[in-house]
């Protein structure tokens, strides 16, 4: 990472980031430094943990991933941020996040879940917007290469380990839920669309299965970037290369959905690699020729760091590289348009 970026965040690029889980919230923490014109479009297929309990008890969409994104973009007082992140240590609320409960309470007050998210956004004075990809009550079903299937995002890991084969396809039940109109609008108007890092089959792809999302991405004139994970994920993507990730994305959407794939070039210490291997994960191999054969350009940059033995995308480095990709594209477009104008003048 180098150079400088002098554009004020108020005038930064319009960025729509699609995903869920830790990967999306990590990305948002970096992007908010460069633009206020930011929209997070978040999956609602989670059915495990505290989110799953609230979903089952209250019949509401799972709040966890959305709450994490709100926390990442919050500009509230430190005590408020600490409160939203607080998890109850024991009793019937053990493991439950106060932020989840707060959003659940707002959902009971407001006429719709997206309005509840909007209200929580105001309380936390967030940068940009956070939107559920849909307000429909959806479940995720995974089908494996041996024909077995399982319903429920939280059950996929266990079932995949039992079946000992790759995931062939995932789908939403019911199929083709309607996307939130504001999410469609954000994608259509974006300068940059980012498929965030995160769990391939349970955080990223579920968004693409919502009716209208893929079409909106295709229609958009934005720069479209997929940020590939640094490590494979036990229970989802063991043995996957970069091209395997892209094939899965295209299989669940359409070929050529994005222009670029951003991968990590930072070295990972051997001791860290060995520790991850014990947990069934490894660095994702960048099979460049196979990726380019799919019509996707590979960009490798040092966007990951190791902290406390964990490999993570660095929010600032990742956001910087995405903003630079946007700037470079704009320069190319300006040069192209300038060349065309000059040619037209010569011809006349």
Feature names for model-found ranges:
Residues 18-22, 196-199:
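Glycine-rich beta-strand-to-loop/alpha-helix junction loops that act as flexible
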Residues 138-197:
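Active-site gating loop/helix substructures
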Residues 45-164, 321-324, 328, 335-347:
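Electropositive, gly/pro-rich neighborhoods at or near active sites that engage anionic ligands
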Residues 2-11, 29-34, 42-59, 179-180, ...:
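Conserved phosphate- and dinucleotide-binding cores of soluble alpha/beta proteins
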